[in-house]
Structure formats: C-alpha cells, structure tokens
UniProtKB/Swiss-Prot annotation:
Outcome recorded upon mutating residue 231 to Y: Abolished interaction with uridylylated PBL2 and abolished ability to mediate cell death as well as an increased sensitivity to the pathogenic biotrophic bacteria Xanthomonas campestris pv. campestris (Xcc)
One GO biological process term: positive regulation of defense response to bacterium
Quaternary organization: Component of a stable high-order oligomeric complex made of RKS1 and RPP13L4/ZAR1 which recruits Xanthomonas campestris effector XopAC/AvrAC-mediated uridylylated PBL2 in the presence of ATP to form a wheel-like pentameric resistosome; this complex triggers immunity toward X.campestris in vascular tissues. Interacts with RPP13L4/ZAR1 and uridylylated PBL2.
Active site per UniProt: 191
Broadest EC class assigned to this enzyme: transferase
Domain Protein kinase, residue spans: 60-347
EC numbers, comma separated: 2.7.11.1
Result when mutating residue 70 to Y: Reduced interaction with uridylylated PBL2 and reduced ability to mediate cell death
Keywords, alphabetical: ATP-binding, Kinase, Nucleotide-binding, Plant defense, Transferase
Record-given protein name: Serine/threonine-protein kinase ZRK1
Organs and tissues of expression: Expressed at high levels in germinating seeds and at lower levels in adult leaves.
Amino acid sequence: MKKQYLKSGSGTRKEKDKAKRWFLDNGSIFLRELVADCNGKSIPIRSFSPEQILKATNNFDSSCFVSQDVYYKWYRGEIEDRSYMIKRFSEDEITGKRHRVKEVYNDIVLSARMSNHSNFLQLLGCCLEFPFPVLVFEFAEHGAMNQRGGVIVNGEESLLPWSVRLKIGKEIANAVTYLHTAFPKIIIHRDVKPMHVFLDKNWTAKLSDLSFSISLPEGKSRIEAEWVLGTFGYIDPLYHKTCFVTEYTDVYSFGICLLVIITGKPAIMTISDGDLQGILSLVRELCENGKLDEVIDPRLMKDITSGQRLQVEACVVLALRCCKERDEDRPKMIQVAKELKQIEASLKNSS
C-alpha cells in the first residue's frame, strides 16, 4: 500500500507533529555531520518544504519515477517552474533507518562540498521533514546511465557515439580525481559505476551518490572499513579481501566502469549454463587473442574511424592497467584523467 505523507493544508495535528519530529531529528544529525566535516565553512543548502516535494513528485507517483538503486529512488519534479532530480531514500524494514543514517548524511554533506565541480550532480537543497531527508539535485536531461553504459530515451536505449563515450569517461575520471586530490583528506567514492553517472543536455557527466564515500586519515594511504560496500562486479578484489580502502579502490572500479562504457556490456554477464563472467576477464581474454574488434561495442563498428579505433585501443589498455591485481601496479586517478585527456586530444591533433 502506498504511504501517504502530509499534504499541503490538510495534515492532522498528529501528522504535523510527526513531520516536526523528523525535522528535529534529521536536522540535529545533519548539523552535527556538517560541522564535523566542514571545519566551520559555510555550505549553502536550500530548505524545501514537504508540500513542495510532494507536489513536485505527485506524492512520489510512478509517473515521476526516473531510476533507482538498492537504497533509493530518483524522481523528476518541478518546483517554482524549474525541473529537479529528487532523491528519496528507502524506508522499508529490510534496509532499516538506523543502518542508513550515516550513508544518507554522507551523501548530503559530501555532495554539498562537490557542488562547485562541473562533473558532480549539484545538490541544491533537501527536505528534513520525512523519515529520511529527501534530497533535491540539479536536473539532468538525459538521466542516469544504465548497467550497459548507455541511456534510455523514450523507452529505448540510445546509442552513444564513441566521442561522447570518451568524453563521459574523461569527465568521470575528472570527478574521481577531484575527490582524491582537492581536500586535505583523500575521499574515496567506493561505488564508481555508470548507474551513478547522470548526463545533462550537453552530455556532460555528473557523478552522484557519495553515500558510501569514506575519507582517509590525513597523511595516511588507507583505512580499514567496517563493511565492504559497493556493487558486485565493480568492487576491487583487494578491498573485498582485506577490507582496506585506498585510492586504488576507486581506480579499479573506474577501470571496470570504463570497460562497460567501451563495450556496451554490463560488468557481470550470464553466459552458458547460467555461469557468470565479469567484463574484465572477457576483455582480457579477447585482447590476449588479438580480438580488439570484439571488445568494442558492435553497434559502433560501422561508424568508427581508424583514428577512433586507436583511441578505443588506448582506453582498453588504460582500463586494464586500472584493474591490475596489485594496487601498486595501478595508476593514480590523476594520471588516468591526464591520459584520457591526451587520448581525446590525439584525434584533434592528428586532423
């Protein structure tokens, strides 16, 4: 049964008291996390009312639904004649409120800090008068990428040309590099994947979902996590084995993400007899057998130029380096971003 929330001008005293209690609970946690994370620096976040959120999403109606992950759903909504992406976290008994509090406030505080970078989905505000805060982000016209590194337009998957895929890969790398280099404490995303990347009207990549992110102690290169968090197929095997998070945890995930964008295949595939195969093992096998043409998304083959084919080859080599077994053999994200910029420029320089 669909849950009903306080509607504009109609709530009972009990409902209003409940919303007020949520506001006080969520507000106190938010303030504590913000003060702890920002060292007194001001981060402006607009406060939206529950009436605005419910009106914008038609009480979270399926007609406004955009996409979802395990713990939340995205909705499209309009507030004051402006379109927004509205993120609503799950409230069911399986995920449980107390298990999700840290991740939710991680997402709010860190997203606010990233709002000055063009390759992060910009957090514009939130509403604290729900069991979990509802987050309001800038609108992304082309929505989120899917598990095949594509986007759905009018119910069908839209084929992204190679130049756009390379641009997206470069911009995701720029975003992760910013996390790793822009702050005194290195921030590790821990869940880099295409489904967390939104695309605006200009196909600019916007990385989102910082709920699993973790900061390394200042001056330290790793931290032991209580739980291994992330998405199957993208999780660094070293992190999975040891529970230690390093900047190379993100490098591995980005490498898988880049392979997905190149191939148009999901990170984990079902093959014969129901067995599973990862994109990494498939690409390694094809490259070892000299079958690069089978690595490239076959839908691109008829339009790809010889120069672009060289770009694809360079990107595949880079992605495989990101996924090396030993983290010391992987490049840092700043180097990955630099190489992708050079690969993108190579075609322009040769023409």
